[in-house]
Amino acid sequence: MTEEKYLRHASRHREIYTNTKKVQQYRKLIIELLLSSHCRDCTTCQKNGMCALQSLAYKVGVHAVRFLNNKKEEKIDMSSPSIVRDPNKCILCGDCVRTCDEIQGLGVIDFAFRGSKMKVQPAFDKPLVETDCVGCGQCAVVCPTAAISIRTNVTDIWDAIEDPSIRVVAQIAPAVRVAVGDNFGIPKGENCFGKLVSALRIMGFDMVFDTSFGADLTVMEESKEFAARLASD
């Protein structure tokens, strides 16, 4: 059979149907197959309500998965102080691989093995803490299913706030005071520092600092040290 019989060349007045009953069935089957080898602990997942796979399942009408999950459960990597990697939630989209390599320039994680055994992992399946990972969190930002997520310390923070013997201080980085607004419908680029300070104080934080204030103190201290060295010479 020649190659031409498989091709559909573009032509005038050609109509392409992208949402027929058959196409809908194919989409539903693809999502079912993804879910069949996927962790289904949605209620306790950090991405619950924001998961791309969960949203697609609702959209295409997957109410039950007909296939059994025969995938071996992988160990969760919690070695990093900032990143948690759960291979059981990975759908092999490759977003984290491209982000780490092409944007961050580190290439800490990549695809390993082939076929049904394929997975995303650091070289030689090392724990993240033993790799060149800098904990930037960009892989977690692009991950659609919480296969890579930011390590949360919410419980520890609340325990510290409720302990009267502990003075709890928050420090806000310049990027955070602008980027945090995206999650609350605030126009992009708007400085939310005042809102952040108010919210943190209401929550129970004793003091809130801007990182730039610390930078000013550092410059002053280093200038003092530099002047002292010049005087001693």
Regions found by a protein language model. Name each.
Residues M1-H13, V23-R27, L35, I150-D233:
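Iron-sulfur-associated redox domains of electron-transfer enzymes in respiratory
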Residues T2-G135, V141, I148-S149, N153-A160, ...:
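Fe-S ferredoxin-like electron-transfer domains
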Residues G49, G61, G94, G105-G107, ...:
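Residue-identity detector for glycine
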Residues D77-P87, T145, K188-G189, V208-G214:
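Hydrophobic transmembrane alpha-helix bundles
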